Amino acid sequence: EKVYGMSKPYINNSQLIVVPKDSDIKTLADLKGRIVAVQDDSTGSYLLEQPANKDLAAGLKEIRKYPDFAAIYMELDNKRVDAAIVDAVLARGYYDKKKPDTYRILDENMGDEVVAIAFRKDDKEFRERIDKAMDEMKKDGTCKKISEKWMGADITVYDK
C-alpha cells in the first residue's frame, strides 16, 4: 500500500498443501523429510521463509521453486515432489475440477490472506469505481455465483 493504491479485498484465500491422493502425508508435521514444491515469488514461498515456519522449512528434505503453477502440477503428476503449497484459488479451480480423484488437500494450511486489486497510487477515482462495482456485485449475488461456479464455494470477502 506504500507504492500502490488497493481496492477493498474481494477474495478470501489460503495457502493449501496438496498431495497425491494415496500419500501418507496427513498433516504439516508429516512434511518432515519430504520434497515440497512452491511457485517462486509466491505467498507460499514467502511463508516458508518466515520465522514462524522456520522449523517446518528446516525439516523439509528440499524446497523446490517453480516458475508457474503448471510446472508444479507436472512435478506432482510425475511424483518428483511429495507435496505442493499453492493458493486455494488455484487449487480449488484446478484440483477440484480437473483432477478430483488424483489429489487431496490437507485440512491444515499455511495461512490465510485476502486478495485485492492494485492500482496506481494516484488513480483514486478508478479505484473507487472498481470498489463500487464490486460492492454492487456482492450485494446482488453475482460474486457469490461466480465464486461457487469456479471455486466450488463462496470465497468472496463481504463487509462486516
Range-by-range predicted roles:
Residues 3-5, 29-32, 68-89, 97-98:
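Short helices/loops that flank or line small-molecule/ion binding pockets
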Residues 16-18, 36-39, 64-65, 83-86, ...:
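Structural recognition of the beta-strand scaffold that forms the well-ordered cores
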Residues 11-19, 88, 92-135, 153-160:
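Periplasmic-binding protein-like
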Residues 1-30, 109:
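Acidic, polar ligand-binding/catalytic clefts
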Residues 23, 63-74, 113:
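Short helix-initiation/N-cap motifs at beta->coil->alpha
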Residues 44-65, 95-100:
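Ligand-binding cleft/hinge of the Venus flytrap
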Residues 13, 21, 39-42, 68-69, ...:
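Beta->alpha turn/N-cap motifs
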Residues 25, 29-43, 92, 116-154:
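Extended ligand-binding regions for polar small-molecule ligands
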